[in-house]
Amino acid sequence: MVEPLLSGIVLGMIPVTLAGLFVTAYLQYRRGDQLDL
C-alpha cells in the first residue's frame, strides 16, 4: 500500500528537483553575465 505512494512521490520530486537545480544554475549564470558587464 505504501510503496506505490512512495514511488509516486519520488517520481514526482525528481523532475521538480532537476528543474530547481536548472533554474538556480541559470540564475547564477545570468548574475555572472551581469557582473561581467
UniProtKB/Swiss-Prot annotation:
Membrane-topology descriptor: Single-pass membrane protein
Protein's cellular compartments: Plastid, Chloroplast thylakoid membrane
Keywords: Chloroplast, Electron transport, Membrane, Photosynthesis, Plastid, Thylakoid, Transmembrane, Transmembrane helix, Transport
Gene: petG
Record InterPro entries: Cyt_6/f_cplx_su5, Cyt_6/f_cplx_su5_sf
Gene Ontology cellular component annotations, sorted alphabetically: chloroplast thylakoid membrane; cytochrome b6f complex
Similarity remark: Belongs to the PetG family.
Species this chain originates from: Staurastrum punctulatum (Green alga)
Major site of localization recorded for this protein: plastid
Protein name: Cytochrome b6-f complex subunit 5
Single GO MF descriptor: electron transporter, transferring electrons within cytochrome b6/f complex of photosystem II activity
One Gene Ontology term from the biological process aspect of the record: cytochrome complex assembly
Domain of life, source organism: Eukaryota
Subunit structure: The 4 large subunits of the cytochrome b6-f complex are cytochrome b6, subunit IV (17 kDa polypeptide, PetD), cytochrome f and the Rieske protein, while the 4 small subunits are PetG, PetL, PetM and PetN. The complex functions as a dimer.
Pfam families: PetG
Statement: the UniProt record of this protein carries the keyword Transmembrane helix: yes
NCBIfam families attached to this UniProt entry: PRK00665.1
Residues that span the membrane, as ranges: 5-25
Functional summary from the UniProt entry: Component of the cytochrome b6-f complex, which mediates electron transfer between photosystem II (PSII) and photosystem I (PSI), cyclic electron flow around PSI, and state transitions. PetG is required for either the stability or assembly of the cytochrome b6-f complex.
